Swiss-Prot record:
Alpha-beta TR is a heterodimer composed of an alpha and beta chain; disulfide-linked. The alpha-beta TR is associated with the transmembrane signaling CD3 coreceptor proteins to form the TR-CD3 (TcR or TCR). The assembly of alpha-beta TR heterodimers with CD3 occurs in the endoplasmic reticulum where a single alpha-beta TR heterodimer associates with one CD3D-CD3E heterodimer, one CD3G-CD3E heterodimer and one CD247 homodimer forming a stable octameric structure. CD3D-CD3E and CD3G-CD3E heterodimers preferentially associate with TR alpha and TR beta chains, respectively. It is found in: Cell membrane. This is T cell receptor beta variable 5-6. Keywords: Adaptive immunity, Cell membrane, Disulfide bond, Glycoprotein, Immunity, Immunoglobulin domain, Membrane, Receptor, Signal, T cell receptor.
Length: 114
């Protein structure tokens, strides 16, 4: 694998362990090169209307990216504008990262709540 490749592993924040959160993320893993764009999707647990996205770099704790509630961004962490999102009427959400950098290589997590 060349130095320009980014490995992206995606897991559910609560759905990956013993707790069944009902959150579904796709794709489950992804490899991209620097400069490309990526879109990650999250379907929340039935009845949940809030979706939060997190980035977890190797050896670090999860860092809050943003939260969507009823199709509007409610809160945003300290991430550049290259990180954007959207929530659809069915409450599913997308995380978009443009102009990928090597430092964007991380675990991306979504969580849903009421």
């Amino acid at each position: 694998m060349g130095p320009g490749l980014l490995c992206w592993a995606l897991l559910c924040l609560l759905g990956a362990g013993l707790v069944d959160a009902g959150v579904t993320q796709s794709p489950t893993h992804l490899i991209k090169t620097r400069g490309q764009q990526v879109t990650l999707r999250c379907s929340p647990k039935s009845g949940h209307d809030t979706v939060s996205w997190y980035q977890q770099a190797l050896g670090q704790g999860p860092q809050f990216i943003f939260q969507y509630y009823e199709e509007e961004e409610r809160q945003r962490g300290n991430f550049p504008d290259r990180f954007s999102g959207h929530q659809f009427p069915n409450y599913s959400s997308e995380l978009n990262v443009n102009a990928l950098l090597l430092g964007d290589s991380a675990l991306y997590l979504c969580a849903s709540s009421l």
